[in-house]
A protein has these predicted regions:
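Conserved active-site tyrosine of GNAT-family acetyltransferases
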Residues: 77, 82, 101
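Long, intrinsically disordered low-complexity tandem-repeat segments
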Residues: 106-116
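Short amphipathic helical patch at the helix-1/turn junction of helix-turn-helix
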Residues: 33, 67-68
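Conserved catalytic-core motifs of GNAT/GCN5-like acyltransferases
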Residues: 22, 63-65, 83-99, 115
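Short glycine/proline-centered loop/turn elements that form peptide/ligand docking sites
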Residues: 47, 69-73, 90-95
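Acetyl-CoA-dependent GNAT
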Residues: 1-40, 44-57, 86, 104-105, ...
Length: 119
């Protein structure tokens, strides 16, 4: 069962992150931010909230797939501690490959502690 985290500004939704927990792993399924709200930390805040919440309930690893051609998203995830560990050939409907990226528990715990201190 997937869970949804939503970022709001005033009463308006400006972004979301969907993730699914399987055993001790959290799988980031989708991240979207209103184009007018990009580069303002919305995706970073959503990702930090997911990692904090899931680490607190026992997640040890996070993983996601990202389009091989999506250079901006790949850089974003790398900057948040995710590491490319593999490739899923022809993963997307158009035949494009996906990069598999993961983040381990040590980094997730560190990020959760930093988020707790800054709130």
């Amino acid at each position: 069962e997937a869970r949804l985290w939503v970022a709001k500004e005033e009463a308006r939704s400006i972004g979301f992150l969907a993730a699914r927990r399987i055993a001790d792993e959290v799988h980031v399924l989708s991240v979207a931010v209103d184009p007018e709200q990009r580069r303002r930390g919305v995706a970073s805040s959503l990702l930090a909230a997911v990692l904090r919440d899931e680490t607190a309930s026992g997640a040890r690893t996070a993983l996601l797939e990202v389009r091989a051609s999506n250079v901006a998203a790949r850089a974003f995830y790398a900057n948040t501690g995710f590491v490319a560990v593999g490739r899923r050939s022809r993963y997307y409907a158009n035949g494009e490959d996906a990069l598999l990226m993961t983040k381990d528990a040590l980094l997730m715990t560190k990020d959760a502690l930093l988020m707790t201190r800054s709130t």
